[in-house]
Amino acid sequence: MTQVAKNDHRLMQVLLSPVVSEKATLVADKNEQVVFEVARDANKGEVKAAVELLFKVEVESVQILNQKGKQKRFGRFMGRRDHVKKAYVSLKPGQEINFEAEAK
């Protein structure tokens, strides 16, 4: 595998936001995974290092998917929503990320 960049400034820019949706909540309850929207140029190693740095938890694995933006019509013009890269982060047993507690 490639060497993971340990630049803290870069790791702070990898995670854009947590994904809060019905599917993300179902996955979190069933598989103990957390879903994040990540930078388009991020890789699995950077996502793992960023989650461990920001939330002080141990990560077991990371799965990444690229979601293409949908075609949308704006009046008579066709447009496209932005492409999104998501990361499904599996935490080690006993680990948990509580977003409500982190915000306080």
From Swiss-Prot:
GO terms for biological process: translation. Keywords: Ribonucleoprotein, Ribosomal protein, RNA-binding, rRNA-binding. One of its GO terms (molecular function) is rRNA binding. InterPro entries: Nucleotide-bd_a/b_plait_sf, Ribosomal_uL23-like, Ribosomal_uL23/eL15/eS24_sf. One of its GO terms (cellular component) is ribosome. The keyword Coiled coil does not apply. The keyword Ribonucleoprotein applies. It comes from the Bacteria. Belongs to the universal ribosomal protein uL23 family. One of the early assembly proteins it binds 23S rRNA. One of the proteins that surrounds the polypeptide exit tunnel on the outside of the ribosome. Forms the main docking site for trigger factor binding to the ribosome. HAMAP family: Ribosomal_uL23_B. PANTHER family: 60S RIBOSOMAL PROTEIN L23A (PTHR11620). This is Large ribosomal subunit protein uL23. The gene is rplW.
